[in-house]
Amino acid sequence: MNKVDVRAKLAELGLELPVAALPVAAYVPAIRTGNLVFTAGQLPLVNGTMAGFGKFDGEITPERAKELAQICALNCLAAVETVADVNKITKIVRVVGYVNGVPGYINAPVVVNGASELFLAIWGDGAKHARSAFGIA
């Protein structure tokens, strides 16, 4: 994958890299080991405020759910920035998403596309990754 100016690419997409949220418990936003960075789970926080509440396919539409997943992905990039330069990212290895849905909700993978599609928009085909998407109630 070619080097990408992440902030410039985000600006082209009408987005910007947020400031990483402060941890609310005994963990760090991200940790680096060698050339790998692992991020903590992220919520759809914008300037410290939840961007959405509710269950998908209940109070939150599928379209809005994808937007919230994109916000979580942006927050992951902000977490990376606490331990490494996001412009040095050369590969997205794995994405895991937990989607709060109504009982019987089966479209968690569609929601998590909001994150995957952001990474693909930034890094192109080089951002193809393994992924798990879980629906939780």
Regions found by a protein language model. Give the residues of each.
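Short, polar/acidic, helix-capping and beta-turn segments at strand->helix junctions
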Residues: 1-137
